[in-house]
Amino acid sequence: MKTLYSLRRFYPVETLFNGTLALAGRDQETTGFAWWAGNARLINLSGKLLGAHVAHAGLIVFWAGAMNLFEVAHFVPEKPMYEQGLILLPHLATLGWGVGPGGEVIDTFPYFVSGVLHLISSAVLGFGGIYHALLGPETLEESFPFFGYVWKDRNKMTTILGIHLILLGIGAFLLVFKALYFGGVYDTWAPGGGDVRKITNLTLSPSVIFGYLLKSPFGGEGWIVSVDDLEDIIGGHVWLGSICILGGIWHILTKPFAWARRALVWSGEAYLSYSLGALAVFGFIACCFVWFNNTAYPSEFYGPTGPEASQAQAFTFLVRDQRLGANVGSAQGPTGLGKYLMRSPTGEVIFGGETMRFWDLRAPWLEPLRGPNGLDLSRLKKDIQPWQERRSAEYMTHAPLGSLNSVGGVATEINAVNYVSPRSWLATSHFVLGFFLFVGHLWHAGRARAAAAGFEKGIDRDFEPVLSMTPLN
């Protein structure tokens, strides 16, 4: 048996790869978890768990800083950001750093500063993580009772929840302060094709802000993803930041009510499952936001949305054929519907052809040409500006349809370029990661509930059918 390539062939299912391996003095016998179960070995060691989390934060911030500097080093100011595979610089540009009218990058120094600040921060976090993982106290309860905790201590858990909520609220207000006082943010709707501006007239009306939550998620409604002006976005952050901070204070000052103590499972794994569930929801919402919303994610930096690229194509050929003498108001297409313009089911004038399904797109280059009943024929004949033509021609050939082999744009479009839109990447990655987090939520929720009910040991291997079957060899 010792001559076999792998001894694992003869081991029952739940045995370790190597039961004798002890990392940092923590083996399976003392912790109940094997080395590969990672932080599960630290469930009751608050000091070591702190080290793991701080080190993890250091890795995250290190990636942000290093990737930021990598993008700065490769950045070509003459090309749009979305043609260069950038995912971090568009976020910095959206916050108003380094850009001017039309989303043109006029200064890359703020991007360099951002990368360096993140790298320096990651070094501090990395040092703290290593210190607490290797040198600091194993548990914090004795030396630093404020930072210590027991998972079953419901009052302490809600206090920690409160502190987290306050930090999230402060984060929301950082965006508010940037938009109000520190140079403003990039507004894709600014006249003439977008610019950085300070937001002065916040939307604080609760009926407007919470009205988004009551909208249908379908069609022209679009739930919160339909937000299309910065006053609402920044005003929403004022509301959200205030709710988080007030909720945080509430959770610090109060103890959980009896119904909450009964309804929830109070264990480390349960809290992990709640957190994973919340992150999954964030991931799914972020996916929809980056895919459809061109206000929070301006097309100048992230490339056009799918509907936007499609409408841009219809607009581009309307402009071309109108110059060649076509009467765009009455020309019929092959199906008998309008070739360039038609009416939506509710009567608005919209672009004809295949792009009719995207008729509720709103984009800054197109809205000036609308009247009270949809697209205005007289404006289409007299008011089209060169910047609108240039932008739509550019967006037409940059549809966010790129596959992994980088054949970007519409596959049959002869003017398409080799590129994958950051919108495709950000939407897909957040959906996939959100899905994985959701599966993790179900897994850990099931384990936590089973443990609370007292049967977490899993299947009894003594009566497994395979044990009574003839060995394969």
Swiss-Prot record:
GO terms for cellular component: chloroplast thylakoid membrane; photosystem II. It is a multi-pass membrane protein. InterPro entries: PS_antenna-like, PS_II_antenna-like_sf, PSII_PsbC, PSII_PsbC_sf. The modification N-acetylthreonine is found at T15. The modification Phosphothreonine is found at T15. One of its GO terms (biological process) is photosynthetic electron transport in photosystem II. Its main location: plastid. PSII is composed of 1 copy each of membrane proteins PsbA, PsbB, PsbC, PsbD, PsbE, PsbF, PsbH, PsbI, PsbJ, PsbK, PsbL, PsbM, PsbT, PsbX, PsbY, PsbZ, Psb30/Ycf12, at least 3 peripheral proteins of the oxygen-evolving complex and a large number of cofactors. It forms dimeric complexes. This is Photosystem II CP43 reaction center protein.
